[in-house]
Design a protein with these regions (language model features):
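Core catalytic lobe of class I
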Residues: 1-238
Length: 238
């Protein structure tokens, strides 16, 4: 006698409802389209993350991305403005890397339109050393104060066509004039970050991104200037 269980009629009805078969196998994964299609304005929900197909220098795209959230931290790897040609090493026979993806808008280093739409106080902006002054000026124009320049020291040089081969990349650490920095790191931090890329080559080839960074380049700023559960903004999906 189910009445002896102590449940009322409504509760018993919910507990004894007959399970029906769905229209598809819940474990069945559909085949992906031959060509993934995304259009301007699409918002992709990737777990807790939001990815927008749009222009991060426009209010509409930024509003769609943030959806009312106001992150205090931005960690970004925008185009450097160096017109990087990922195919030149193959053409001269230096290597056969699969990392041939072209960085769009790589003729521009000043992204103040994007900085102006960021509602927070703290920014880490990776940039090309040749345009460090341009990037600093773009941040200062948006009421940021440069606090430090971080240097990613690579374990090996990047073969170039100049007299000197680059073995580092810089990142500006900036805080709004009225900001606090929201520092969560310890007192042992320095501006020199020796970060290895060994072991990530296969992953780099899989993404075909020609200038992909190690995850540590983005993880360290997040740990130093935010707390678990807080949102972090990346206007260039770097």
């Amino acid at each position: 006698d189910l009445a002896l269980t102590g449940f009322d009629d409504d509760e018993l009805a919910r507990l004894t409802i007959e399970q029906t078969e769905g229209l598809t196998d819940p474990d069945d994964v559909p085949e992906p389209q031959a060509e993934a299609v995304s259009v301007l304005g699409d918002v992709w929900l990737l777990g807790r993350h939001r990815l927008v197909c749009g222009d991060s220098t426009t209010v509409e795209a930024v509003d769609a991305c943030l959806a009312g959230v106001k992150p205090h931290l931005m960690v970004t790897d925008p185009p450097y403005g160096v017109n990087y040609d990922p195919g030149w090493r193959q053409r001269v026979g230096i290597n056969n890397s699969e990392r041939m993806g072209v960085v769009l808008n790589d003729d521009q280093a000043d992204w103040r339109e994007a900085w102006a739409l960021f509602p927070g106080e703290v920014a880490y902006v990776w940039h090309g050393g040749m345009h460090a002054a341009v990037v600093a000026a773009s941040l200062e124009a948006c009421d940021f104060v440069i606090r430090a320049q971080i240097i990613w020291a690579k374990e090996s040089l990047v073969m170039g066509r100049g007299h000197y081969h680059w073995q580092h990349e810089p990142c500006w650490y900036a805080v709004r004039k009225s900001g606090t920095g929201h520092w969560s790191g310890d007192r042992k931090q320095t501006t020199l970050w020796p970060i290895a890329t060994r072991g990530e080559a296969a992953a780099d080839d899989a993404t075909v991104h020609s200038t992909q960074k190690p995850v540590e380049c983005m993880r360290r700023p997040i740990e130093n200037n935010s707390s678990p559960g807080q949102a972090v903004y990346e206007p260039f999906s770097g």
